């Protein structure tokens, strides 16, 4: 479906995800410099039922060592050459309700796109262009941006799952940080969700 719009790149977003324009601008710069896949390594989570806000620092050594350089699923940005290579099918034809991020990472590995740091990202010449062939992630502070996943009672990945896997990876925050990045009317709508979608 997305292919009909002839995009230069696609950002993977859920209906309960918000990212700021700073992240989009950062992605545009990276895609224009030849990166095939960029994304975030950390994000904020708001649990609407419990009214709790937290920062998740990303995959860590404790329970996710095998995913250390992998980006989170929210906000992954895939460039057109990569989309063409995978025929615009990020999940490889699988009908999934869970583990979407890991399934996408595995699909990308099938075509040679592995999680790497920017400094270790392979660079190749292709069709007269320089391409950076890796799954490269950045921290929100490197992008001067903000990303949040609004959790309800029905989310695929619950708030508690982050806490249970690695309690040290979650830092609870005061709600004031939202006001730095999100419009007031949007914050008000988020606060009234009360666990509903």
Predicted segments, located by residue:
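Short, conserved alpha-helix that lines the donor NDP-sugar binding/gating region
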Residues: 1-3, 105
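Active-site acidic short loop of glycosyltransferases
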Residues: 5-8, 33
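Short beta-strand-to-loop acidic/aromatic patch adjacent to the donor-nucleotide binding site
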Residues: 7-18
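A structural signal for short, well-ordered beta-strand segments and their strand-loop junctions
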Residues: 12, 37-40, 116-118, 139
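Surface-exposed, flexible loop/turn segments at secondary-structure boundaries
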Residues: 18, 45-46, 154-157
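Conserved catalytic core of nucleotide-sugar-dependent glycosyltransferases
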Residues: 20-97, 106
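C-terminal catalytic/acceptor-binding lobe
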Residues: 94-197
